[in-house]
Amino acid sequence: EIEEFRRFAGDQGRERGVTIAIEPLNTKESNILTSVAEACVVAARVDMPEVTVLADFYHMDEEDEPLTNIVDAGGRLSHVHVADTGRLHPGTGSYDYPAFWQALAGAGYDSRISVECNWRDFPTEVAPAMRFLRESFPG
C-alpha cells in the first residue's frame, strides 16, 4: 500500500512539477519508514524521479541511524532537515555536524537545508544557529 500510494503521489507530482520527498521519522513518532535506508528501498521500488528521500538529522540521531545511509541514498536524496540534541537549534547540542556534512558530500548533495527544530526564542536563537551552520559547513 505504501508503494502504491507513493506511485500515485509521484504521478500527481509529475503532473504538477512537484517532487515528493519521503521523510522517515523516528519510532517514537511513526512505525513505518523509520530510516533513510527504508525510505530509499521504497523510492527504489516506486522508481519514479518525482519520489525522493529526505534525511532529517534529528530523526536519524534518535534512531542511531548510521550517516553512511545518507551516502548510500546518493541521488535519491532531495532535501535535508537539521536540528540538534533535544530537537533544539543547531549548535546547541552534541550532534556530529562534521560527519553529517561529510555524509552529505559523499551523497553528492548540494542543495538546500532546512532548520526544523523547537525554537524557544526565535528572535534570539536564529542568528547563533545560522552562524553555527555557516561556520561548521565546509563549503
Question: Language-model segments: which ranges?
Answer:
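Active-site acidic/histidine proton-transfer and metal-coordination neighborhood
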Residues: 1-52, 62
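Acidic (Asp/Glu)-rich catalytic clusters
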Residues: 7-15, 44-47, 68-77, 98-109
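Hydrophobic faces of well-ordered beta-strands that scaffold small-molecule active sites
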Residues: 20-22, 51-55, 78-82, 111-115
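Active-site-proximal loop/turn and secondary-structure-junction residues that shape catalytic pockets
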Residues: 24-28, 57-59, 84-86, 119-121
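Distinct, well-ordered alpha-helical segments
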Residues: 28-46, 61-74, 91-94, 124-131
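A short, conserved beta-to-alpha structural element at the edge of catalytic cores
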Residues: 76-89, 106
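A short, acidic, flexible beta-alpha connecting loop/helix-capping segment that sits on the rim
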Residues: 114-125
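Generic C-terminal helix-cap and adjacent flexible tail
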Residues: 135-139
